[in-house]
């Protein structure tokens, strides 16, 4: 590698930050996302998801169904520059049914921002997604939101995070008041108080007044009881709390805590500035050739998401690629690890929700969009130089199952195409009966909304009306050693055998007790709730 290329890679990696936001539904994730874009200059006016119809929808919620319901259904990528940093914000679905898409997105993230509602504290979806982050040892930054509404005491929230998640906490800033009496935050880094002025629904950057803690006018600006409460709180957290340990943060053992209100812009800019200082830059990734450093001279990356019809006018399909190492350049030729073919990447795109623009170069930590004419699958590796393959992305175990019926035979081709493309992008898992007379696909989902999304998109994007016929199963287990192991045990009671999109055997059970009973009856049978990694394999044709 030339000295110039080495210096270029080191410089570009150093200025990149990549993160995903995780939260329970309604914690304010889409709002925080838009406010970060507002401060980053990527948008000039934030559009609230629940705004009036005359106002535009949230930038990150681009699918028609998202705009109708005011929820995030798909993961999107939002890239922008801020204070010399190149930021890749991986916006994840906020609805609990879409944890699979979130898992795939977290596989491409270097950091996670955990959004917590100040009134509700930790909620089930937040805990579940935290466990996924913990598996990857992702650094976690916590933003406690909605301080402009009545909520729980800040110390109680920190205590809950420490006890339930096993994380040390360090409050980077501290709230002054709450609800109607919320006055702003104290920045412990610079020992300054930020007093915020509410903007019109937080559409523009907040104009804040910054005052040193020792300034004589503080008592006049704050209610006296809030002033003394702040002094008492600071004395407590600085006397008893730990020091900020960035090594522990980067190992996922300590979480920096920020307080604010995304809707009214309180604390958002403070969070963004501190995050850029503290967050982990693009990290190494494990591969078949060992750990690959982001400054490795050869380009490599992996596909973590596929999305069809992001632009309905063009009926396109886009592969989202996380760049892991080296320098990506437009028109470069790369190796496709799964097929062994050489591919010329002639139309790479910089992504911003559903918007696209041509891309010339990209570096580790960036996410690029590639036109996908059926070439790429989730988990695929592309590379230049020495052959390698990154670790695949496992699937969640589904909990709801249903036959998907096509009542109109004249729409068979559109039905097949729609199901195939939605399967490829991971909108839902597809399984099939081993009974050859039953050709209808079985939808396997982690929540009811996934069924609704599949039906909506088949109608909206492919012109196909469908019917759902629910099945009485709630547990799926993959047979670890495949068909030979299943045939060796003979007949199995209280289970039905199906095959997944890769032709692998899956047992469906009505409940967990039945699954445990089968294991007790057949001790040599090995079952797994997580699908085998799919890297290097293409689903069977429909």
UniProtKB/Swiss-Prot annotation:
Molecular functions (GO terms): GTP binding; GTPase activity; translation release factor activity, codon nonspecific; translation release factor activity, codon specific
PANTHER family named among the record's database cross-references: PEPTIDE CHAIN RELEASE FACTOR RF3
Membership in a protein family: Belongs to the TRAFAC class translation factor GTPase superfamily. Classic translation factor GTPase family. PrfC subfamily.
CDD domains, alphabetized: RF3, RF3_II
Gene3D superfamilies noted in UniProt: P-loop containing nucleotide triphosphate hydrolases, Peptide chain release factor 3, domain III, Translation factors
This protein's UniProt keywords: Cytoplasm, GTP-binding, Nucleotide-binding, Protein biosynthesis
Domain tr-type G: from-to ranges: 14-283
Pfam families reported for this sequence: EF-G_D2 (PF22042), GTP_EFTU (PF00009), RF3_C (PF16658)
GO annotation, biological process: regulation of translational termination
Descriptive protein name: Peptide chain release factor 3
Function: Increases the formation of ribosomal termination complexes and stimulates activities of RF-1 and RF-2. It binds guanine nucleotides and has strong preference for UGA stop codons. It may interact directly with the ribosome. The stimulation of RF-1 and RF-2 is significantly reduced by GTP and GDP, but not by GMP.
Keyword Transferase carried by entry: no
Binding residues annotated for GTP, in chain numbering: 23-30, 91-95, 145-148
Domain of life from the UniProt record: Bacteria
Protein location: Cytoplasm
Organism expressing this protein natively: Cyanothece sp. (strain PCC 7425 / ATCC 29141)
Cellular component GO terms held in the UniProt record: cytosol
């Amino acid at each position: 590698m030339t000295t110039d290329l080495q210096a270029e890679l080191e410089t570009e990696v150093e200025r990149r930050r990549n993160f995903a936001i995780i939260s329970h539904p309604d914690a304010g994730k889409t709002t925080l996302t838009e406010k970060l874009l507002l401060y980053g200059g990527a948008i000039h006016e934030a559009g609230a998801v629940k705004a009036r119809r005359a106002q535009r929808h949230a930038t990150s919620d681009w699918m028609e169904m998202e705009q109708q319901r005011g929820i995030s259904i798909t993961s999107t990528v939002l890239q922008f520059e801020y204070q010399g940093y190149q930021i890749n914000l991986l916006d994840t679905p906020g609805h609990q049914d879409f944890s699979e898409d979130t898992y795939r997105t977290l596989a491409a993230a270097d950091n996670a921002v955990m959004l917590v509602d100040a009134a509700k504290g930790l909620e089930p979806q937040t805990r579940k997604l935290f466990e996924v982050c913990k598996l990857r040892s992702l650094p976690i930054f916590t933003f406690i939101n909605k301080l402009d509404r009545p909520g729980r005491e800040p110390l109680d929230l920190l205590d809950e995070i420490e006890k339930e998640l096993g994380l040390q906490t360090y409050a980077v800033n501290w709230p002054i008041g709450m609800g109607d009496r919320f006055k702003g935050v104290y920045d412990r880094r610079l020992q300054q108080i930020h007093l915020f002025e509410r903007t019109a629904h937080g559409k523009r950057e907040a104009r804040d007044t910054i005052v040193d803690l020792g300034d004589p006018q503080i008592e006049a600006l704050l209610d006296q009881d809030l002033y003394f409460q702040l002094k008492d709180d600071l004395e407590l957290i600085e006397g008893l709390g730990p020091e900020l340990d960035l090594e522990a943060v980067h190992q996922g053992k300590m979480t920096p805590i920020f307080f604010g209100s995304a809707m009214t812009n309180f604390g958002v800019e403070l969070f963004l500035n501190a995050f850029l200082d503290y967050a982990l830059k693009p990290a190494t990734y494990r591969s078949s050739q060992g750990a690959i450093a982001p400054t490795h001279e050869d380009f490599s990356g992996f596909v973590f998401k596929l999305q069809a019809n992001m632009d309905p006018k063009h009926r396109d399909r886009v592969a989202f690629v996380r760049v892991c190492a080296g320098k990506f350049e437009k028109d470069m030729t790369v190796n496709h690890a799964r097929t062994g073919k050489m591919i010329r990447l002639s139309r790479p795109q910089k992504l911003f929700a559903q918007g696209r623009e041509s891309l010339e170069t990209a570096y580790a930590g960036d996410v690029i969009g590639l036109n996908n004419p059926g070439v790429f699958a989730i988990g695929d590796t592309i590379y230049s130089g020495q052959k390698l393959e990154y670790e695949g992305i496992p699937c969640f175990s589904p909990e709801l199952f249903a036959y998907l019926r096509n009542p109109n035979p004249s729409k068979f081709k559109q039905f097949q195409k729609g199901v195939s493309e939605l399967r490829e992008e991971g909108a839902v898992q597809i399984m099939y009966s081993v009974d050859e007379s039953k050709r209808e696909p079985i939808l396997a989902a982690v929540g009811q909304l996934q069924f609704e999304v599949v039906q909506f998109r088949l109608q909206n994007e492919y012109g196909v009306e469908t019917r759902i016929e629910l099945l009485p199963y709630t547990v799926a287990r993959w047979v670890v050693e495949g068909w030979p192991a299943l045939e060796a045990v003979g007949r199995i009671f209280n289970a039905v055998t199906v095959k997944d999109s890769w032709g692998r055997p899956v047992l469906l059970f009505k409940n967990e007790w039945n699954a445990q009973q089968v294991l007790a009856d057949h001790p040599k049978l090995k079952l797994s709730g997580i699908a085998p990694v799919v890297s290097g394999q293409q689903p069977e044709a429909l």
